[in-house]
Amino acid sequence: MGDKTKVQVSKLKPGRYIIIDGEPCRIVNVTVSSPGKHGSAKARIEAVGIFDGKVRSIVKPTSAEVDVPIIDKRVGQIIAITPDTVQLMDMETYETFDVPIEGGVDDEVKGQLTEGITVEYWETLGRIQIKKIRGE
């Protein structure tokens, strides 16, 4: 899988995803400035990083193309928890891997992780983050 694709700036909306400075981000706001007599319309895109939570913004012409991440949303089971990593097993492929707690676990679920529970995790651009706990 390519992990990213190209999309025209004019097609972007809040709630969608974009790659800014190599970091996948969720778009919070898109404002388009009307062009003057000569020139093209510009879009200001404000977004929040999926992994680090930092606010980023870019300004691009609406006719330009930007990279958009392909996010693979999967289900896994927590096998073990160490002080700095979580060992996760994919429920479809039964592949196991380690996810760092810092940056790899969403802040909302950090305190709720226990061994044996089922979680939803996102994989994009070679990085993994546990997003939420699944109810069985």
UniProtKB/Swiss-Prot annotation:
Protein's UniProt keywords contain RNA-binding: no
Compartments (UniProt record): Cytoplasm
Name of the featured protein: Translation initiation factor 5A
InterPro entries given in the database record: IF5A-like, IF5A-like_N, NA-bd_OB-fold, Rib_uL2_dom2, Trans_elong_IF5A_hypusine_site, Transl_elong_IF5A_arc, Transl_elong_IF5A_C, Translation_prot_SH3-like_sf
GO cellular component, one term: cytoplasm
A Pfam cross-reference name: IF5A-like_N
Family: Belongs to the eIF-5A family.
